[in-house]
Amino acid sequence: MIFSVIRRFSKFCQGCGCTFQHINPEVEGFIPENKYKNTLIHNIKTSDTLQNIQRNDEIKLRDFKLTKPEASLYQNPEFEDLDSIEEIEERSKSAIPLYEYQKKPKLKPIICMRCYKISKYGQLPQVDCEITSKPPLTSLNEIFDPIKFESIVLYVIDLIDFNGSLIKEVFDISMQKKAHVILILNKIDALPLNAKLERIYQWGINETRNLFKNLDVAPVSARTGEGYSKVIKILKELNESTPDSRVYVLGATNSGKSSFINTLAKKCWDLPEEKFKRPLTELTTSKYPGTTLSPIEISLRSLKMKIVDTPGIPTLSQITFFLSSQDATLLIPNKKIKPVVLTATPEFTFWIGALVKIEMVSGDFKYLTFFVSHMCTIHKTRKNLAEDVYERQAGKLLKPKYNREIEWEQRVVDINCVSKEKATKDIVIHGLGWISVTGLGECRFIVHLCKNVGFNIREPLMPYEAKPDLVQFTKGHTINSEKYKIIKN
């Protein structure tokens, strides 16, 4: 059993799914030949030992079940069965002492040099990759090719970049293949403290109402494991009516697909059927886009399913594609977002890093609530000083910045605000975050950003964050979101 798993995995990287090769370090799948052979030999020897341990455990458990008392000794057979089952489970849990389990030999993961550097050092080596160099629709069609009709598709969305990671063509192709789509709203742990799961769920339903019929929506956190019980429940229900035992996990680059699968696998390990049957390794995850290069299949016996992780679909509308890989990681929150509330009038302009400029051109006093990474600075300055601040401070006080010369374009936003207590609309910049607008009366904003970066106006996700006690009254200051202090220029 274990040996067959090793043989299946020996040709492919267990972290990113690419095929191993020993020739060119600049191409995906490179692993030194001696390292590959030594690890493979170690795993083959270890598998024999693990099989013997597993066989002995099964014999002990079977012998214990044979000692179960006769039903005739009990007046009520229902209570007899319940007591016996509980006793067997307790005995099976303690069948292997912890110190013996810890002394078991361990199988070593076989991963490529790229995955090794990502997981050990947090570095992203630049290697040639076929699928990520293709247009998004071409990549999407290639990912969907092996998916059978009426399969289950888990579509993972980055909730912090909902519009940037939502690819409508996924729903179109899924309808053609009559797939059952479950929309996974990942990274709820990055939302502010007062975010309510029920409100997020209903918001997700409303935003996708016109894209797909009978869509299941599940808000989850791959980091904390919150929300996974609903996903497992849906998968169990669908498994009985689905001809294909494979569940395909799709999503845009950096939406958290691999992290989602790793957490799902851990949750399934807690089920009795999955005990001592963990996969050989976890999928490689990182803060860099495009970590997974080829499809990877993981078996979950407790669900009687196989989970297939697919390469991230490139969405060229995200602002991160116009930044260096190092600066792109600054836009990915690694802790809860703390909303920044600023007052807006036509006299002032706002910079989000050196990436986006927002100016109010008409209307009365409004609140702007910024939902962006804590590593991205927000600067409020007078309108006549905005360009000078950019020329002097891009990449310094205003961070991050674009990694190339770009063509700027303007987007006009007209909003009729209807409440001082609740945001009316969100201004969304793909790959960056969003800004909620709160107040009374009509107003117009002009948003300056890089050409081809995605932009949306939507219903507010977090509409109640513009509270008076959160307002930062600043003039000519920068909010350094990394430390949440007001720092003078």
Please report, for each region that a protein language model flagged, where it lies by residue.
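Canonical P-loop GTPase G-domain recognition
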Residues: A179-I182, A190-S255, I261-E274, R278-T281, ...
